[in-house]
């Protein structure tokens, strides 16, 4: 660390990404990359003609992609927020909805970036232990008066909480954001997106990195009440309005149009998970009931 670093960050423990093999011959199971390539439509969207337009700035609003995602999820474009991977959205959420007086709560065993963001913004956080069966006890998050952050399905356990349990958390924390990180939702979980019509404090975050086979493109999106989306847009436009490049936007649009391709791939991955689980249990191992791709 140099002598120029602010004392605020002197003790910060940064997130450590997993090693990225340079020969690109492997699928990294530890980061849950998809073994399948992007859809043919996505590959076709990155044409030489579009590459030649990289001298132009991308659309900071991502209007076309927002409209396509809104149609896919049955919401309005004003309910969609786009960013450079779901990590970016998590970052903005901690920045926008937490401070020294408004804390956060999340499972003790979960995605490693949650405590990093809490430390980065000096947010008082409560790390709640899992149950003995490694599940999340939703009751621990009721009436907690903090921003609640839950990965559903959870990583690294793959276990999920029900919509009824999420709804109870929302009801009992009406003045705090409830962020549900659905990075692995397409592998067998039940999305809570429909609940945004009922609860204006729900923020659902998804990614293109897992089921949509675009980890290298860096694209994530959130679905929430228009007011929450406006808050996130304010943070985005105060930091980097052009945080999604032109080619990623085009790839994202093509991926929505070829959604059936990704649904089928997710089914194959889930089937492999179930087969592996069955074999391991037959060998005497204890395996959690995962709804993720692991």
PLM feature spans:
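N-terminal "arm"/small-domain region of PLP-dependent enzymes with the aminotransferase-like
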Residues: 1-56, 144
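Phosphate-binding glycine-rich loop
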Residues: 63-103
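Glycine/small-residue-rich loop that forms an oxyanion/phosphate-binding "nest" at active or ligand-binding sites
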Residues: 85-98, 162, 180-184, 188-189, ...
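PLP-dependent aminotransferase-like
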Residues: 96-151
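Active-site phosphate-binding strand-loop segment of PLP-dependent enzymes
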Residues: 131-186
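PLP-dependent aminotransferase class I/II
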Residues: 201-281, 285-288
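Short Gly/Ser/Thr- and Asp/Glu-enriched loop/turn motifs at secondary-structure junctions
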Residues: 288-294
């Amino acid at each position: 660390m140099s002598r120029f670093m602010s004392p605020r960050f002197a003790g910060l423990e940064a997130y450590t990404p997993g090693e990225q093999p340079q020969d690109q011959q492997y699928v990294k199971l530890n980061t849950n990359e998809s073994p399948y390539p992007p859809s043919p439509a996505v590959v076709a969207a990155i044409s030489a003609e579009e590459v030649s337009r990289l001298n132009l700035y991308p659309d900071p609003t991502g209007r076309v992609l927002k409209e396509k995602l809104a149609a896919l999820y049955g919401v309005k474009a004003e309910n969609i927020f786009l960013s450079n991977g779901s990590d970016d959205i998590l970052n903005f959420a901690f920045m926008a909805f937490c401070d020294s007086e408004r804390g956060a709560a999340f499972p003790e065993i979960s995605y490693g970036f949650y405590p990093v963001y809490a430390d980065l913004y000096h947010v008082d956080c409560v790390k709640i232990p899992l149950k003995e069966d490694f599940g999340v006890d939703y009751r621990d998050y009721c009436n907690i008066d903090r921003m609640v952050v839950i990965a559903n399905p959870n990583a690294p356990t793959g276990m999920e909480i029900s919509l009824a349990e999420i709804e109870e958390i929302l009801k009992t924390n009406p003045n705090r954001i409830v962020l549900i990180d659905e990075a692995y939702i397409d592998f067998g979980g039940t999305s809570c997106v429909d609940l945004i019509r009922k609860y204006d404090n729900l923020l659902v975050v998804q990614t293109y990195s897992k089921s949509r086979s675009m980890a290298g493109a860096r694209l994530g999106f959130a679905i929430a009440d228009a007011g929450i989306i406006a808050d996130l847009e304010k943070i985005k436009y105060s930091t980097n309005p052009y945080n999604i490049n032109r080619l990623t936007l085009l790839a994202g649009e093509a991926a929505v149009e070829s959604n059936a391709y990704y649904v089928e791939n997710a089914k194959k991955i889930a089937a492999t998970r179930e087969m592996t689980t069955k074999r391991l249990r037959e060998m005497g191992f204890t395996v959690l009931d995962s709804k993720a791709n692991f």
